[in-house]
Amino acid sequence: MKARELFEKLKKELNNFSIYDIMMIRSFIEKDAKYLPPQYKNHYVEAMMKYLIETFNEIRKKSVDEIQDEEIDEEKLNEMLNRIERFRKYYTPDEERFINLSKILCPYLAFIAKKPLHPEYLTFPGNVKIIKKGNNYYCPVKNKQLNEYSLCEFCVCKSIDELK
């Protein structure tokens, strides 16, 4: 599959989301963040919602002609989508909306925009952030989150260890 074809598909699916859906997704993110350390919880929710809305609007405003039409690794794309499906814990309508939007935003970020799956302005526990150096991104938690449920292997970020 080519990047423009994927972008058109993602953009079309994005049109199914309303402000009501975004409000439900925020509710889900707040609920899902309940186990984060209190000092990070509010920041995490705010940063993730800001990035979600920025990415949402970026897709809406971008035209297909702006997309570099390179080949997308469909096997990796399908693995990412399957992992997102496995995020389910609660089987609630707000979680369903979150899953469906993640299946649009994450492939866009990873395969088309080539941006991190978390925003650069998100502070992770330990008071660390993603660092951009030149055209490369370095993540402080990438090596700590590589498991069958994470999306880290699809993210453009390199491990921060590569900076040292």
Swiss-Prot record:
Membrane-spanning parts? none
| Intrachain disulfide bonds | none
Q: Cite the Pfam families for this sequence.
A: DUF2115
Renumbered to this chain, the signal peptide range is none
Write down the InterPro entries for this protein, in alphabetical order: DUF2115
Family assignment from sequence similarity: Belongs to the UPF0305 family.
Record-given protein name: UPF0305 protein MJ0646
Originating organism:
Methanocaldococcus jannaschii (strain ATCC 43067 / DSM 2661 / JAL-1 / JCM 10045 / NBRC 100440) (Methanococcus jannaschii)
